[in-house]
Regions:
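Helix-start (N-cap) detector for alpha-helical repeat units in TPR-like alpha-solenoids
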Residues: 4, 38-39, 72-76, 106-107, ...
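Alpha-helical segment of the N-proximal tetratricopeptide repeat
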Residues: 5-33, 43-50, 140-167
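Register position in tetratricopeptide repeats
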Residues: 16-17, 50, 84, 117-118, ...
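Structural marker of alpha-solenoid helical repeat scaffolds
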Residues: 33, 67, 101, 134-135, ...
Length: 261
């Protein structure tokens, strides 16, 4: 059975219906012919965890990480397994690693927030809360696209992102995601156009404008970059990161005295 003929959506639907035995049976059948199928190994681990077959779940994750060591969702699953087994310190380390590899994993952020809050680490808790708030505001399909994009599945991410934008042409988060894909593929003109339009739709979004400034910088449009950074500093005068970017741009343009003011 070829990888692209296996019906992952049917399996995930079974899992949503909590028919984990049925889903796992389908996954194991496919793994017999495709033992290194990333998604099958991951979903088999999830099914095994829900069925409380924790040793099997660990074995699936071990196999998965041998062939795909940078899959954030796998580390999130390791976090779940360690948390269930009472190994909270290890669980937090895995959740943190999951978020570093894939910042769109809201479950990991939730557990990190609860842990940091309980341990009175306000700065870390506030950061986790900010990420959770951002992710909760995103439609589920865009959250999924973010996750697969972070796993390097550019073709699928682009296809689904374009489908979403056809129905929601002014959604700036989707435009930003598509710009990330274009940037990774080296299509810098497309990246610039997408971010330019996104900034027009949402001019008060500092993160969007910063991304726009960075692609302008990458394309060596120094004057336009400086214009965007100046706007950021005017709109967000207390943001030290934006101030640092402006100083860097001034230095790049040769005005050293102005940069240190």
């Amino acid at each position: 059975m070829k990888e692209n003929t296996f019906d992952i959506e049917k399996v995930t639907y079974s899992m949503k219906e909590e028919r984990f035995v049925e889903a796992l049976s389908s996954l194991e059948f496919n793994l017999a012919s495709q033992p290194n199928h990333f998604e099958c190994l991951y979903l088999a681990a999830v099914c095994s965890r829900y069925l409380k077959n924790y040793k099997d779940a660990q074995n699936y994750l071990d196999r998965l990480l041998r062939v795909n060591p940078d899959m954030g969702r796998a580390y999130q699953e390791l976090g779940h397994l360690n948390r269930i087994n009472g190994k909270m310190r290890s669980a937090i380390a895995y959740y943190r690693q999951a978020c570093e590899l894939n910042p769109a994993l809201i479950a990991s952020w939730n557990y990190l927030f609860e842990y940091y809050k309980k341990n009175k680490n306000k700065q870390a808790a506030d950061h986790a809360a900010e990420q959770i708030k951002k992710l909760q505001s995103i439609p589920n399909i865009l959250l999924y696209i973010s996750q697969i994009l972070n796993e390097g599945k550019l073709a699928i991410a682009e296809e689904k992102c374009r489908e979403f934008l056809k129905k929601n042409p002014t959604n700036t988060y989707a435009m930003s995601l598509l710009s990330d894909i274009a940037d990774r593929l080296g299509h810098f003109d497309d990246t610039e156009i997408l971010l330019e339009n996104a900034v027009k739709f949402k001019p008060e979004d500092g993160e969007l404008r910063m991304k726009y400034a960075l692609i302008l910088r990458k394309k060596q449009k120094f004057k336009e970059t400086m214009e965007q950074v100046n706007i950021l500093c005017e709109k967000f005068p207390d943001n030290l990161s934006y101030q640092a970017h402006r100083a860097s741009e001034v230095m790049q343009n040769g005005d050293h005295e102005k940069a240190v003011k």
